[in-house]
Curated annotation (Swiss-Prot):
Keywords attached to this entry: Cytoplasm, Ribosome biogenesis
Name of a matching Pfam family: RimP_N
Organism lineage string: Bacteria, Pseudomonadati, Spirochaetota, Spirochaetia, Spirochaetales
GO cellular component terms given for this protein: cytosol
Protein name in UniProt: Ribosome maturation factor RimP
SS bond partners: none
């Protein structure tokens, strides 16, 4: 089942302006906390350029400065990219990955095709033989190919 991306996430709101200026999309944020420390994992993507190690190292420093100035607990920060066969986890990712080839499971088997267009509650899925409007609520699984 596809989730709706939580734009009320504190970390998202602290870093979205920076990543937006750099043409980098925030795909996912995971926060693990116990009493006074935690771990923040952020998955990033750009349609325009490759997020190489040098870029991610510089971006890590910038994000770390923002988060350390605003969060009241200690944490470690991990940045990563989505990988070749990423599972699509939120409605927002269908917009980000428009034009990309995916494997989609609606019933009990996968079908390959492309994300033609993303809409607020659905997306257009194109295979070799058809184009269909798919509601996010009907998606059992989806991943990049």
């Amino acid at each position: 089942m596809i989730k709706y991306f939580d734009k009320n996430n504190e970390v998202f709101n602290l870093i979205k302006d920076l990543t937006g200026r750099l043409n980098v999309e925030i795909l996912e944020i995971n926060i693990f906390r116990n009493k006074n420390n935690g771990k923040i994992q952020i998955v990033l993507y750009s349609k325009n350029f490759s997020l190489d190690i040098d870029f991610l190292t510089d971006l890590h420093k910038m994000i770390l400065l923002i988060l350390e100035a605003n969060l009241k607990y200690g944490f470690t920060l991990e940045l990563s990219t989505p990988g070749i066969d990423r599972k699509i986890k939120s409605d927002r990712e269908f917009k980000i990955f428009e034009g990309k080839k995916i494997k989609l499971m609606l019933d009990n088997e996968f079908e390959e095709g492309f994300i033609l267009e993303s809409k607020p509650k659905s997306f257009i899925f194109k295979t070799d033989s058809k184009e269909v409007n798919v509601f996010y609520s009907d998606v059992k699984k989806a991943r990049l190919v």
